[in-house]
Design a protein with these regions (language model features):
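Active-site-proximal loop/turn and secondary-structure-junction residues that shape catalytic pockets
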Residues: 48, 110, 152-154, 180
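Conserved, well-folded catalytic cores of nucleic-acid-processing
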Residues: 13, 59-60, 142-149, 166-170, ...
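Phosphate-handling DNA/RNA-contact segment within nucleic-acid enzymes
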Residues: 3-142, 146, 159-160
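Amphipathic alpha-helical transducer elements in NTP-driven molecular machines
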Residues: 87, 133-136, 140, 156-164, ...
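C-terminal or mid-to-C-terminal helical accessory/interaction module adjacent to the motor/catalytic core
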Residues: 171-226
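Hydrophobic alpha-helical scaffolding
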Residues: 79-83, 125, 129, 149-153, ...
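Short secondary-structure boundary/capping segments
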Residues: 119-123, 163-166, 191-194
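Phosphate/diphosphate-binding loops
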Residues: 154-170, 174, 178
Length: 226
């Protein structure tokens, strides 16, 4: 694909090369060649709470996904974008979060979009399972209740436990939910009706403290140890 189309158009329109690099839209190779960072990718824009675009996530969606080292590419931190401060979809979801008095945190942008299209609009994403205190505090401005929906593998479970501790430390209530058959929220939302999705979330979310206790006791049959 053309790895210069955006930068060529931007330079022609009068944008300075230094700003294309500072904002992370482009980078320079050792030979001085200016490269479009998101060439050949579907772009998801990250909006600030005030509705301004501050960064991007680029994802390979076609057959090149197989074997591609970087399926996702994110904007690097810049003067206007700090990954540890932003939450994908929060600007669009903040009113729904207030109305529901609850926020659902998922791993990816596609998860947010599919769930929103299935009428679950109080949903946001970080960068995978990474979560920071600043992101939690930003969510706390809109609600005291958060549900984590992560992949059900060991990495997802461990991330849910780790992030639950972080969220509890900020005085919020936390529930966790793992979808069946290794599905992610994007898959589940596409294969179920909006009503089924809402019902599954309502009936299968577990308080994180209870989840931690059950996981600790899993396989322990000695009544004294239990």
């Amino acid at each position: 694909q053309d790895r210069h189309a955006m930068s060529d158009a931007a330079l022609k329109a009068g944008y300075k090369e230094e700003y294309l690099i500072k904002t992370g839209l482009c980078y320079k190779r050792e030979n001085g060649e200016l490269i479009d960072r998101f060439a050949g990718r579907v772009i998801f824009p990250w909006f600030s709470l005030s509705g301004k675009v501050v960064g991007f996530n680029g994802r390979v969606l076609d057959s090149r996904t197989h074997g591609v080292m970087q399926k996702y590419v994110n904007s690097p931190d810049s003067e206007i974008y700090h990954k540890g401060n932003e939450l994908f979809g929060l600007n669009q979801a903040k009113q729904a979060i207030r109305k529901a008095d609850s926020v659902i945190l998922v791993e990816g942008q596609a998860d947010v979009i599919s769930m929103s299209q299935s009428t679950v609009e109080n949903v946001v994403a970080g960068s995978g399972t990474a979560l920071t205190v600043n992101q939690v505090r930003k969510l706390h401005r809109f609600t005291n209740n958060i549900t984590l929906i992560y992949d059900g593998d060991d990495a997802g479970v461990n991330a849910a436990l780790r992030n639950s501790d972080l969220i509890h430390g900020e005085g919020m209530n936390v529930s966790v939910l793992f979808l069946p058959d290794g599905q992610d929220p994007d898959d589940f939302a596409k294969s179920h009706t909006p009503e089924e999705l809402q019902e599954f979330i309502a009936n299968n979310s577990t308080d994180s403290i209870i989840f931690r206790i059950n996981r600790t006791l899993d396989g322990v049959t000695d009544p004294i140890k239990r």
